[in-house]
């Protein structure tokens, strides 16, 4: 078929596929505007440490508040509450979450929107079932928890919807099953092979994606490195893989 005979078909395809779309040739730079402001209701204002969207439609958000500066004078009167907001009502939280210590991280369970897990300033892990009120359904014990604030926590995508992993500046990655928080199910020390005193690297962020492999994850450290880890490496020494040094 000659090329000119394709043109009407291409035009119809373009009309159908790009219906309702138009090119913006304006010279105005991209912009955004504030829709709502969700303020800490506590008298002593705190830092927003973590935000997690409600997994079923994004109609709510859970926000963790804490003061992270050690020995900050404001900590004496600091509230430990964190909150869940309905995005259509920024004036009043829909629900309070009452941990034993202020939350540094907080995440909705992607498979069950009633469940949240959080890591506290005092190193404890707690989880909530929002159908049962503001108090944690369970909390780990001091002796088996992190020794520093829990900076990051992530739900794992496995056979159950109850597993998560946490990290802290104490140099540990701990795996948990929220149905039995008496002790972590596994532990990994973020060993720094370049450290003369074998001091572990402090974890400050944690990224897990099932697409990268169900046992693989990344940890960002306070030393500026990104550590690639494999939970199920055949050799325990290989659980820490590539270490990408900071600039």
Language model segments and positions:
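Acidic and/or Ser/Thr-rich intrinsically disordered tails and linkers
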Residues: 1-84, 136-140, 162-165, 171, ...
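A conserved hydrophobic secondary-structure block that centers on an alpha-helix together
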Residues: 28, 73-78, 85-118, 128
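Conserved loop/turn at the beginning of each blade in beta-propeller domains
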Residues: 44, 99, 146-149, 197-199, ...
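Conserved beta-strand position repeated once per blade in WD40 beta-propeller domains
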Residues: 50, 105, 152-155, 205
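Solvent-exposed strand-loop boundary residues in beta-sheet-rich modules
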Residues: 88-89, 131, 179, 232
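Asp-box/WD-like beta-propeller blade repeats and closely related beta-sheet repeat scaffolds
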Residues: 102-103, 135-158, 162-164, 191
């Amino acid at each position: 078929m000659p090329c000119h005979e394709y043109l009407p078909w291409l035009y119809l395809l373009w009309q159908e596929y790009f219906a309702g779309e138009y090119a913006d040739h304006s010279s105005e730079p991209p912009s955004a505007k504030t829709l709502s402001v969700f303020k800490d209701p506590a008298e002593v204002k705190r830092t927003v440490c973590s935000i997690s969207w409600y997994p079923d439609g994004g109609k709510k958000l859970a926000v963790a508040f804490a003061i992270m500066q050690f020995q900050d004078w404001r900590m004496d009167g600091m509230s430990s509450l964190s909150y869940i907001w309905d995005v259509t009502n920024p004036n009043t939280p829909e629900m309070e979450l009452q941990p034993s210590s202020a939350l540094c991280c907080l995440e909705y369970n992607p498979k069950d929107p009633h469940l949240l897990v959080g890591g506290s300033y005092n190193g404890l892990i707690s989880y909530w079932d929002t159908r049962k009120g503001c108090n944690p359904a369970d909390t780990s014990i001091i002796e088996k928890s992190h020794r520093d604030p829990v900076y990051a926590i992530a739900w794992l995508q496995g056979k159950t919807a109850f597993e998560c992993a946490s990290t802290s500046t104490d140099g540990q990655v701990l795996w948990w099953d929220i149905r039995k928080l008496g002790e972590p199910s596994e532990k990994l020390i973020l060993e720094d092979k370049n450290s003369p005193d074998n001091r572990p690297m402090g974890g400050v962020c944690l990224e897990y994606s099932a697409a990268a492999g169900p046992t693989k994850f990344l940890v960002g450290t306070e030393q500026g490195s990104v550590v690639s880890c494999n939970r199920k490496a055949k050799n325990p020494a290989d659980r820490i893989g590539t270490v990408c040094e900071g600039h």
